[in-house]
Amino acid sequence: MPPYAAELARIEVLLQKLCTESTNRQLGQLAWEHIATGGKRLRARLAVQTVCAHGARADLGIAWGAACELLHNASLIHDDIEDGDRFRRGKPALWARYGTAQAINAGDLCIALSYAAIASVPVSDAVRWQLTSVMTQASRRIVEGQAAELDLLSSGVPSWRDYADCVEGKTAALFGLPIEGAALIAGRSCAEAMALAHRCRQLGLLFQIQDDILDLFGSNGRDMPGSDLAQSGKASAFVVEHLRLHVGDVDWLMRILTAPRKETSRQQIDEVIQRFADGGALAAVWQRMDEIRCELVESQEISREPALAALVQEFVAAALRPVEHTRPRAIADGLGSNG
């Protein structure tokens, strides 16, 4: 049996229970239908494993892991609506099957249920209040990050800092969240938990870049390769790095990025992907990933705690493994010679 399989199974049971026992059973079933499509349950794993890394029992992280997964899935439901993605995890997105209005409601329900899950965390009222505060702050960051992403191209060519700031709010907040809450559950101070969460948000940046790579050079369960690229007004790590390297391509790429999705052809997307690969953006993105990895695993907050360091290394490997085949040979050779 895989590590923490029992705890993850209990999280799954709790997720289904919270959704299906909703006052509006039809809406609860919609929320559960989305959650049950799968996913890697990374936030649940982070919650349970971080509790253990701090020396506490794994079962103390079950309800917190469910709370984090509910907020994460709420963000996915809303994200699919805003991006117009008709597929999620290889299946029809909730809005594409049941309409935008009910999908919004299902996402909102997941947010509300995340707080219901916190009520089940077996800690003192004081710690439970801290968890509620942490959840609220993460929710705010996610919404602000999503709004910033939608406006990323409206003020000109985005920098890497602009891109990272968006990810910091949208994706990274959902990686810092389970770690911060788990640290609180295990008895760490608010300051210690916050410092760990701030550092571990870099995991979210790695996983977002992974998603950017899979969108172009792999499969991320959406309706077509380049789905994010075709989405009007959406910038990725590749857009940022390509425009840094090829300023003369600004007008060409911006026309494609800001065109309505239905007006973006398969040929245009293929051309963009080819230019990203040939023009150095792929190599530049990989260099960024390696820099983030080194900064994270070598940081004082992580390296001084062996159990936590091992956990972070495990999740860094999980971020890199699905896209390792896209790593340019020159970068791979360089890592080998340094290893």
Go through the PLM ranges and name each one:
Residues 231, 291-294, 303-306:
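A structural signal for short secondary-structure junctions
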